[in-house]
């Protein structure tokens, strides 16, 4: 059928519906979550009393950061093992057993980056080792193919990991085709020209962020690595003059507009703590959704999405725009009638701009109802995010959100 409303494409889940039914077995252990990621800033943390780098002290720092702010996992990306081909032996600078023990004590799981080729040669042996170590999952990388042999190998990886209680993030992958339905431990796929490329280029435009939900994301979850708060890469990698073409509020919105049950918190922990009031949204936002509503959308121009958290019933809204400043009028008709809600809005400041003033944002909290309509202005390359919960007696003095 042909639908005149572009939002209908966003609601399409045909790839998932046509996929194989879930395999038998207990999947209650599978936990979507946020993951602290060190690759973006190359482990260049500062203000600490140890030498940062690929070592035990640095990764303990990430575990402590994750535990403090409710982040579920940390990722040890490429470089943790003695080589990319020997992924059963950590570098001598890393006491992986101690990291896993420390993470378990703090409630933070450890996920390991792996190259696909050694997995192909010794899949069960490597995954047995990871299970015995206490690793929670793998990010497998550089497959870069979609021939029949590789497609079968994806299935083998997912099955072997499921049997051992490991989550999977397919990086360097082709777009998903429903494998996450068959194996619920498969949480995400790259299969996209994602934000990590901003580390070494400025190719990703605001238009890109407004186009992907209508193209790549229709196929399934997408590991886009959002959450950058400091847009000039030279801040963490001196001499690198790349720039993220987004405002800080836009980066918050991507946690809602870009669907993935596994979402990176990609920036430096110090950057998050510098903008702690904005980071609160990343702390709060859910990743496991009961319902999604596509409120406003025009391919390549803008998109506004509202999603309802599965466990809490709270709503989260995200909106992004292209290189044009625009104002959108938000409906709240998805909320229950007769109830009051408290909404916290994270929006671009009046002088925000993705090129000249990306860190300018405002935060406002107030009451909303099902019949509320709210005008929100987005800067060039900007956006907004909203968290919504039911009001309590303690909120009775709050004014209407404006």
Question: Where do the model's predicted regions map?
Answer:
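Conserved structural scaffold segments of CAZyme catalytic domains across common CAZy folds
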Residues: 1-105, 383
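Conserved, mostly hydrophobic/aromatic
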Residues: 66, 141, 168, 257, ...
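Aromatic- and carboxylate-enriched substrate-binding clefts and catalytic-loop regions
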Residues: 77-247
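Solvent-exposed beta-strand/loop surfaces of large extracellular or lumenal domains
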Residues: 141, 345-371
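Acidic/polar loop patches that form or flank catalytic/metal-binding clefts of enzymes
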Residues: 167-172, 263-272, 291-293, 329
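Glycan-recognition and catalytic regions of carbohydrate-active enzymes
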Residues: 270-316, 351-357
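Carbohydrate-binding surface patches
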Residues: 299-342, 384-387
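C-terminal beta-strand-rich structural cap/linker in extracellular carbohydrate-active enzymes
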Residues: 365-402
